[in-house]
Amino acid sequence: MNALTTIDFNQHVIVRLPSKNYKIVELKPNTSVSLGKFGAFEVNDIIGYPFGLTFEIYYDGEEVSSDENRDSKPKNKIPIGKVRLLSQEIKDVNNDKDDGQSEPPLSIKEKSVSLELSSIDSSATNQNLVNMGSKAQELTVEEIEKMKQESLSSKEIIDKIIKSHKSFHNKTVYSQEKYVNRKKQKFAKYFTVEYLSSSNLLQFLIDKGDIQRVLDMSQESMGMLLNLANIQSEGNYLCMDETGGLLVYFLLERMFGGDNESKSKGKVIVIHENEHANLDLLKFANYSEKFIKEHVHTISLLDFFEPPTLQEIQSRFTPLPKEEARALKGGKKNSYYRKLRWYNTQWQILELTGEFLYDGLVMATTLHLPTLVPKLAEKIHGSRPIVCYGQFKETLLELAHTLYSDLRFLAPSILETRCRPYQSIRGKLHPLMTMKGGGGYLMWCHRVIPAPEPVSENATAADSSEKLAEHGAKKQKI
């Protein structure tokens, strides 16, 4: 089963709810997932379906409600329902009402709304609509809550709300659709399962409010960063990531395409300033620990700039033959393998900081870049890109001015991305009323190796005459 296109066990997915919110879920076998007021479902019921499908939670009367068995279950226990494809339900209704006429294709939500309003009268204008407030709705809040506790489907609840609305027929078709969509966001019990890509994870963090955690990143700025850095599957890249592992996830996804069994040998070397690297968000990446350990290596700034020498490592520890190591017992064996892990880590640091040159430098950090980038660039191969992301333009301007005067860097440029999303409704097109402003800035340049300055003939003659004069002066002293 392809985990990139098919829903499978033991993977993280992102669930889109009717309220346009998102929820990250880990699909463990034989467990249930609670979506709050939208219901709960069994994980086994959605396994094997492709990503992007919309499911509906429904109840056929066999489930135990929250009012029953109060002694064995808590009062707020959400009943677990069954799952069916929402598109399949709409398709069945369309087959029953098919009259042979072709209509333009609509989305699943538009189809469901159009079906609900097909048998309801509407007004051409809002001229006869009187704003009565809550008096226009005959159903009380208690009656609606009772229907929800009885586990009625969202369609039944919304139909009763529409029939009980005194002035619903005086609304225009567009106003009726907006009204139904608002009710669906409250009472609908459907959800969409999508693959948890790096872009979806970034959007989830932005919607959640963790903008400072991701340093005001946007999907557009990350896409431009990956293109400017020329990220490839066989490359070895130096990275500084202060977003909790999100930037590393973007790099891994561009290098390996989410394939957990990729044969590519590319690596990401993460430099961190603390005792341990913060790569917490990689737990959502659906990569195995073995894969991450093979392709992601971490090293502190101190070890990168001042690595241990070979003599220091060999003087502190010498590995034993395998037979002698196996013969150790008790605490000596544990102490030996702990020192062996330290020994292997020190050797890895030597390999990463030796004469090896990297294929690019990608940074998203709050450290002082004008002093840090020139030092890290010494480990970057010639004709390779350097891309630095920053929340503010001023920090990157200072970096660009520093690199302008350094012949090792070619054409430092500061870039900014702006994406203005539009909402498209049938017959209408306009920008979103609320949107995230900005997405950070990028500083991009190339690491080059300056050629030695050519020596002119006049300079050569002057040097030779100076040497002859010095030689004559020495003879006179003798």
Curated annotation (Swiss-Prot):
Q: Which GO terms describe its cellular component?
A: nucleus; tRNA (m1A) methyltransferase complex
* Compartment annotation: Nucleus
Keyword Iron applies: no
Residues covered by region (Disordered): 456-478
Q: Does the keyword tRNA processing apply?
A: yes
Q: Which InterPro entries is this protein grouped with? A: TRM6
List all Basic and acidic residues biased stretches: 464-478
Q: Which GO terms describe its molecular function?
A: RNA binding
GO biological-process terms attached to the record? tRNA methylation
Q: Which UniProt keywords apply?
A: Nucleus, Repressor, RNA-binding, tRNA processing
Q: What else is known?
A: Present with 2580 molecules/cell in log phase SD medium.
Concerning its family, UniProt says: Belongs to the TRM6/GCD10 family.
Subunit-level organization = Heterotetramer; composed of two copies of TRM6/GCD10 and two copies of TRM61/GCD14.
Q: What does this protein do?
A: Substrate-binding subunit of tRNA (adenine-N(1)-)-methyltransferase, which catalyzes the formation of N(1)-methyladenine at position 58 (m1A58) in initiator methionyl-tRNA. Also required for repression of GCN4 mRNA translation by the upstream open reading frames (uORFs) under conditions of amino acid sufficiency.
The protein's name in its UniProt record: tRNA (adenine(58)-N(1))-methyltransferase non-catalytic subunit TRM6
Q: Which organism is it from?
A: Saccharomyces cerevisiae (strain ATCC 204508 / S288c)
> Source gene?
GCD10
